[in-house]
């Protein structure tokens, strides 16, 4: 729900309410609001590729690592980067040594869940965009299907109940400004 709710902060109807000058209380001027909204998608493709790199590295390190062979961490990371990365890191980079998400904190082979949560959040929010950002019927359905069940129901089942269909990548791509460059997900 937190990533879903972040969408409201970007709405033109909401952003002026939560942004103001710290001394005067004056709302952020319209031209600044427009620039702030325009910055939302800046480098979003690069950011998405980076998150996919992290997720693929996480999957591969947990699926392929064989302690009898010795250290393969840098080899696997290099292969992943060769496949996905846009910018090569400097030779002294030791990202794998500090990527604690995949070795602690319960995210082992689960880093992809960050991006998957974004997919679900963007798609759920698109239901509101379709009906009106503050549509009470959609809000009630979201409350009943998602919030009220919490962790007592499989997240995908709850999502499908809310949207009446499986998740789609399109809303996240649109929200990220990536759909406008002619990519398709089919």
Region locations from a protein language model:
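Cation-handling catalytic/transport regions enriched in His/Asp/Glu
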Residues: 1-186
């Amino acid at each position: 729900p937190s990533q879903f709710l972040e969408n409201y902060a970007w709405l033109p109807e909401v952003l002026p309410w939560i942004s103001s000058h710290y001394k005067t209380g004056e709302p952020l001027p319209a031209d600044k609001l427009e620039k702030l909204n325009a910055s939302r998608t800046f480098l979003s493709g690069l950011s998405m590729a980076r998150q996919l790199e992290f997720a693929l590295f996480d999957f591969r390190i947990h699926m392929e690592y064989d302690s009898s062979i010795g250290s393969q961490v840098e080899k696997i990371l290099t292969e992943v980067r060769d496949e996905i990365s846009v910018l090569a890191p400097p030779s002294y980079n030791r990202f794998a040594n500090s990527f604690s998400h995949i070795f602690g904190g319960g995210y082992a082979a689960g880093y992809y869940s960050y991006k998957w949560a974004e997919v679900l959040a963007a798609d759920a929010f698109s239901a509101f965009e379709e009906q009106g950002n503050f549509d009470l019927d959609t809000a009630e359905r979201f409350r009943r299907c998602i919030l009220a069940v919490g962790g007592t129901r499989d997240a995908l089942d709850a999502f499908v109940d809310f949207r009446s269909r499986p998740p789609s990548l399109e809303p996240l791509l649109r929200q990220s400004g990536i759909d406008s460059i002619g990519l398709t997900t089919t």
